[in-house]
A protein has these predicted regions:
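Receiver (REC) domain switch/active-site residues of two-component response regulators
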Residues: 56-57, 177, 237
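Domain-level signature for soluble enzymes in the chorismate/prephenate branch of the shikimate pathway
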Residues: 215-314
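Active-site mouth loops of central-metabolism enzymes
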Residues: 12-17, 37-42, 62-63, 94, ...
Length: 314
C-alpha cells in the first residue's frame, strides 16, 4: 500500500500541512504506474468525499481526530456502509476507552473493514521516543477486540529513524499485523518529520532483517517447559498480590495514625526517599527506571486512596 499525507494536521500553524487535493491526481498516477493500493488520512467529510471520488483505497483517521468523539461521529456518518478499509490511529493521550469508542462508532455505522494503527502516546515524561509505545494499551485492545487488525506506525512513535527497526521487531513479537512506515528518497530534506523518514532501500533492508516468529510450537518438550515456567510466574504473581494487599493494610494503619494526630496524608520527603531507594534497588535487579517509576507511583496512589478512605470515616 502506498501511503501519503495529502492533508496534514499539524500541532501548530506555519508548518507544512500537505499540498491538499492536488495530490489526489498524483495518487491516481501511483496506482496506475505501480498497481499498489493507496491510502491517506481524512479528518472531515469533505476529505472523505474527495478521497472516495478519486478512488483512494484505504482511509485512516489520525490521532488528533480520534480524541474528538464529535468529529469521529461525523466521519463515521460520512462513511456509513462503506466497504473501504478504515484504519483508526490511537488518540494522542493514553486512553484505551477513547480509542475503543472511536472504533465502536465506525462499527455502529455499518463499517466492517476496520483496523487500528498504534502510533504511540504523548507524555510529559521524557523518553527516547517521540511518542511513548505504552505496549500494554494495545495488548488490552487486542484482548477486547481479538479479531481487529493492528498496525504499527513506528515512524511517528520513534521520531528517529535509528529506533524504527527495534519497534517493528517488538510489534511482530506482539503479533501485530503490519506496519505504516514513512519513506522518502531524500529524508534529510523532507518537508515534514525528516528525522523519522527512511529511504526505500532502507525500508527493504529493514523488512528483510525482521524475524517473524511462530505463534506457538507443538513440540512436547517446549510445551512442558513453558508450562513449568508459567507455573512459576503464577506463584510469583500470587505472592506479589498478597504482598501488595499486606502493604495496603499497613498504609491504612498509617492513615489511622495520621487521622488521630491531624497530619496530612501526603509526605513529600518520605515519598522522595521511597522513590530514590526503589530506583537503586530496581537498577540492581535490572529493572528499568521507567517501570519502577510507574509501578511505585501506582502503589503510592493506591496507598493514598486507602488512607483517604480511613480519614473520611467517622
Amino acid at each position: 500500500v502506498f501511503r501519503a499525507g495529502i492533508w496534514k494536521p499539524r500541532t501548530r500553524p506555519g508548518y507544512f500541512e500537505g499540498v491538499g487535493s492536488l495530490a489526489l491526481q498524483w495518487m491516481k498516477k501511483v496506482k496506475l504506474e505501480t498497481g499498489m493500493l493507496t491510502t491517506t488520512e481524512v479528518a472531515n467529510p469533505n476529505h472523505i468525499d474527495l478521497a472516495l471520488k478519486n478512488e483512494i483505497d484505504i482511509l485512516w483517521v489520525g490521532a488528533r481526530t480520534t480524541v474528538n468523539p464529535f468529529i469521529i461521529q461525523e466521519i463515521a456518518e460520512a462513511l456509513r456502509g462503506t466497504e473501504k478499509i478504515v484504519l483508526i490511529k490511537n488518540p494522542i493521550n493514553p486512553d484505551l476507552s477513547l480509542w475503543l469508542g472511536a472504533i465502536e462508532r465506525f462499527y455502529s455505522s455499518n463499517i466492517k473493514n476496520i483496523g487500528a494503527i498504534h502510533r504511540g502516546f504523548s507524555t510529559y515524561e521524557k523518553t527516547k521516543y517521540r511518542n511513548n509505545p505504552e505496549w500494554q494499551i494495545t495488548i488490552d485492545l487486542q484482548r477486547k477486540l481479538p479479531d481487529l487488525p493492528l498496525i504499527l506506525d513506528p515512524s511517528h512513535m520513534a521520531g528517529r529513524r535509528d529506533l524504527i527497526f527495534d519497534l517493528c521487531q517488538t510489534a511482530l513479537d506482539l503479533n501485530y499485523d503490519g506496519f505504516m512506515i514513512e519513506t522518502h528518497n531524500d529524508p534529510d530534506n523532507a518537508w515534514s518529520d525528516s528525522k523519522q523518514q527512511i529511504t526505500p532501500d532502507s525500508l527493504k533492508q529493514l523488512t528483510q532483517n525482521l524475524k517473524v516468529r511462530r505463534a506457538t510450537n507443538d513440540d512436547d518438550f517446549y510445551l512442558e517447559t513453558l508450562n513449568g515456567l508459567r507455573a512459576q510466574i503464577d506463584v510469583h504473581d500470587n505472592k506479589l498480590i498478597n504482598t501488595l494487599g499486606n502493604r495496603m493494610k499497613v498504609a491504612e494503619k498509617i492513615g489511622l495514625l495520621k487521622k488521630k494526630n491531624n497530619v496530612a496524608i501526603f509526605q513529600s520527603k518520605r515519598w522522595n526517599e521511597i522513590l530514590a531507594n526503589m530506583l537503586l534497588e530496581g537498577e540492581e535487579k535490572k529493572l528499568s527506571e521507567e517501570f519502577i517509576l510507574k509501578f511505585f507511583k501506582a502503589i503510592h496512589q493506591e496507598s493514598i486512596n486507602h488512607q483517604e478512605n480511613i480519614i473520611k470515616k467517622d
